[in-house]
Regions:
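Hydrophobic alpha-helical transmembrane segments of multi-pass inner membrane proteins, especially
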Residues: 5-211, 250-310, 335-339
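Glycine/serine-rich anion-binding loops at beta->alpha junctions
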Residues: 91-101, 141-143, 223-228, 315-332
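Transmembrane helix boundary and interhelical junction motifs in multipass membrane proteins
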Residues: 144-149, 227-232, 243-245, 262, ...
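Long extracytoplasmic/lumenal interhelical loops at the membrane interface
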Residues: 223-259, 282, 286
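A juxtamembrane structural motif centered on a specific transmembrane helix
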Residues: 304-352
Length: 352
C-alpha cells in the first residue's frame, strides 16, 4: 500500500465530507449516503491495491467487452432521464455503463499494448484508436458530450504514453481544428447554448446562464479566507444548483475562500505527481501506461470541473473527483486509485 497516495486521498475525502455536510443542509440522508459510498469505495480500493498488476491486466478485455455490450443495451433499451438515454435499469439496480468504460478502456488499451510491446507498429495504434472510438461514439450518441470527451482524453493519454508518433498527433490536431465548424453544426441546441453562455451568461440569467452566474458569485464572495464552514449565503439560501455534485467546488470556494481553493488544488496536484512518480518507477509497460493515464485523467477531471464552475469552460456535467456526492463516480475513481497503489506495491512481477 502506498502510504503517501493513501494519505492524500483520505485528506481530500475528509474535506469532501465536510463540504457535502454543508451543501446538503446537514441532511442525514446525504451525509450517511456519502459515508457509505466512501466506505465502500475505500474497501474496494484496498482490495484492488493488493491484486498484482499482471492479474489486473487480464481483466481488461472482458471488462471492455462487457462495457461496450452494456452501452449498446443503453442505446436500445436505456432509460431516458433529463432528455438523455444514459441509464440502464435492470430492475434491482439502475446505473450508467459509461462509468464502467472509464476504467475498462485504459485497462483494455494497456493490456493490448503490453501484449504487443516487442512488435509495436502503426497498425497497433490503429487498433487502439478503434478500441477508443467504439465506446466514444456510443456515449456521444446518448448524448453525453462531457463523458465522451473525458473518455477520449483518457484514450489519447494512453496512446501517447504507448508511443503514438508526433506526426499523427499533430495531424489529428490539425484535422480536429479544421472540422470545428462541422462539429458545431452537429451539436445539440442546448450544447451550443452552454458554449455561448461563456461569452455572456447574463443574457439568460434565469436559464442557461444561471449555473455560471450563481457559482461565480459564490466563489468571488468567498474572498481570501471564505465565509466559514456552513456560513456560505449562496449555498445556504439555495442559489447554487447541484451543489452537492457538479457544483460542489462553488460551495467550497464560498466557505473556504481562495486560500482553501489553493490548498485543495495543491492536494490534487500532489496526487497527480505521486501517480506520475509511480508510473516512472513501474517495471512493466502495463503499469506505466495505467499509472500515467489514471494520473492525467484525475488532472483533467479536476481542471474541467473547476473551469466549468469558475465560468471559463462550458457546463458539461463533470463531477469534481473525490469531492462530489455520488456512489458510482466515487467507486470508479477509487478503483483507479487502487490500481495506482497496486502498481506501486507490486514492482516485482512477471510480464503477462
Amino acid at each position: 500500500m502506498d502510504g503517501i497516495l493513501l494519505t492524500l486521498v483520505v485528506l481530500v475525502l475528509g474535506i469532501s465530507l465536510a463540504v457535502v455536510t454543508s451543501a446538503s443542509g446537514q441532511s442525514p440522508v446525504r451525509i450517511s449516503g456519502h459515508l457509505v459510498n466512501m466506505g465502500l469505495a475505500l474497501v474496494l480500493m484496498v482490495l484492488i491495491a493488493n491484486v498484482p498488476p499482471h492479474l489486473l491486466s487480464k481483466v481488461g478485455p472482458p471488462l471492455y467487452a462487457t462495457g461496450v455490450i452494456l452501452l449498446v443495451g443503453v442505446a436500445l433499451f436505456g432509460e431516458i432521464r433529463n432528455g438523455a438515454r444514459r441509464w440502464l435499469d435492470l430492475g434491482f439496480i439502475a446505473f450508467q455503463p459509461s462509468e464502467l468504460l472509464k476504467l475498462a478502456l485504459p485497462l483494455m488499451l494497456a493490456w493490448y499494448f503490453q501484449r504487443n510491446e516487442a512488435v509495436l507498429r502503426a497498425k497497433h495504434f490503429m487498433v487502439g484508436g478503434i478500441l477508443l472510438l467504439v465506446p466514444f461514439l456510443l456515449i456521444l450518441r446518448q448524448p453525453d458530450l462531457g463523458t465522451a470527451l473525458m473518455l477520449g482524453a483518457s484514450g489519447f493519454y494512453l496512446l501517447f504514453f504507448a508511443g503514438l508518433p508526433w506526426k499523427v498527433i499533430l495531424g489529428g490536431a490539425t484535422l480536429g481544428a479544421a472540422s470545428l465548424p462541422v462539429v458545431w453544426g452537429l451539436m445539440h441546441d442546448y450544447q451550443q447554448r452552454r458554449v455561448l453562455m461563456l461569452l455572456d451568461p447574463a443574457s439568460d440569467p434565469l436559464g442557461a446562464g444561471y449555473h455560471i452566474i450563481q457559482s461565480t458569485i459564490a466563489i468571488g464572495s468567498g474572498g481570501l479566507f471564505g465565509k466559514g464552514w456552513m456560513q456560505g449565503t449562496q449555498n445556504q439560501l439555495d442559489f447554487i444548483p447541484e451543489r452537492t455534485t457538479d457544483f460542489i467546488y462553488a460551495v467550497f470556494g464560498e466557505e473556504f475562500g481562495y486560500a482553501g481553493a489553493i490548498l485543495l488544488v495543491c492536494l490534487y496536484l500532489a496526487i497527480v505527481a505521486r501517480g506520475l512518480v509511480i508510473a516512472a518507477r513501474a517495471p512493466t509497460l502495463f503499469g506505466r501506461l495505467m499509472a500515467a493515464t489514471l494520473s492525467l485523467n484525475l488532472f483533467t477531471y479536476v481542471f474541467v470541473n473547476m473551469g466549468m464552475v469558475s465560468g471559463i469552460l462550458p457546463v458539461v456535467g463533470v463531477p469534481l473527483p473525490l469531492m462530489s456526492y455520488g456512489g458510482t463516480a466515487l467507486v470508479t475513481l477509487l478503483l483507479g486509485m487502487g490500481i495506482l497503489m497496486s502498481v506501486a506495491t507490486h514492482r516485482q512481477l512477471n510480464k503477462s
